[in-house]
Structure formats: C-alpha cells, structure tokens
Amino acid sequence: HPICIEIGAGKGKHALLFSAQNPQHNLIAIERTREKFLAMQKQHEIEGQTNLNPIHADALPWVVHALHPKQVQQFFILYPNPEPHNPAQRWLNMPFFEFLISRLDQHGTVTLASNIPEYIAEAEQQLINVWKLPFVKEVIPATSARTHFEVKYLERGELCQQLIISKPEGYITRF
C-alpha cells in the first residue's frame, strides 16, 4: 500500500475524509497539539478507518526517525502556520524540506495549501529558484471543506490556493 502523510492534521477532518475516500491508501496523520490530536483520535474511533494511523508527535523528528527514502507517495501540508515573524520556519524555506522530498517516491507529490497569497508566492519562488521542482498552482474551490481552517477561510470569501509539487524521476537529494 502506498503511504500518505499529513503533517499538522489538526482535528483530523481531512485525514478522516481522505482515508474514507481512498481505502487503497494508508494515511499517517501527524498532529503535535495534544488537544487536536485527541479530537482526531476520538473521531477516528467512531469512524474506524483501518487505513488511518493518527500520530501524536512533532512532525520533523518523527519524519526523520520513521520514514525511509522514497517511501511516501503523498505529503499533505494544509494551512500550515504561516510563521509571519519567522520566515526561516516556513516549510519551503527550511533545509528540512530537502529531507522531506528525499522521503517522497518518484512522481510523488506534496500538497501545500494556504489562504495567504504571499505565502504561496514565496513558496513558488523557492520551488523555482532553490528546489527546482515542478508544481501546479490551483485555486481551491469555494465548495471545498477539507479542514476546519479551510471551511472558515472560504466562508469569509478568502482566496485559498494550493501548490501540488511533484518529484520528477531522477531528482537527487543529499539524503
């Protein structure tokens, strides 16, 4: 079974939906905040998807210790903290992003969603100039409801966008 990973799964809205709709994929949903993790766990106990594995952990050390190179088919990073005062902590600005890509199988994808146009624009520049990875930018339809944040932002009429980043065949990382 292909492995998919959601980083910062929150209360698990997307994780539960994705695992129910994609029984052929195993999803590991990682959430650091105890309160949100427990909410996800509780809902998972009710719904019972056998292909969903909620994990209470900080994603960075967990990814480093738990994943092998080229093991992951899809990463989801949906509405991450935009780190307004700490640009170095944004996903595509971190050296760690290279390690994340090393865990992605050839033709695997990273889905990065945000309601902040500047965050998406900066990520695009990083993909072009630093990571040299192909991507597709999409506007998220107003009817989408993958996460609690997404619902809130779209109800407010905010522009939500995502980058679907691909790992081409033969892409080399140092890890």
Language model features: what each stretch is:
Residues 12-16:
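Glycine-rich SAM-binding Motif I of class I
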Residues 33:
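Conserved SAM/SAH-binding beta-strand->alpha-helix loop
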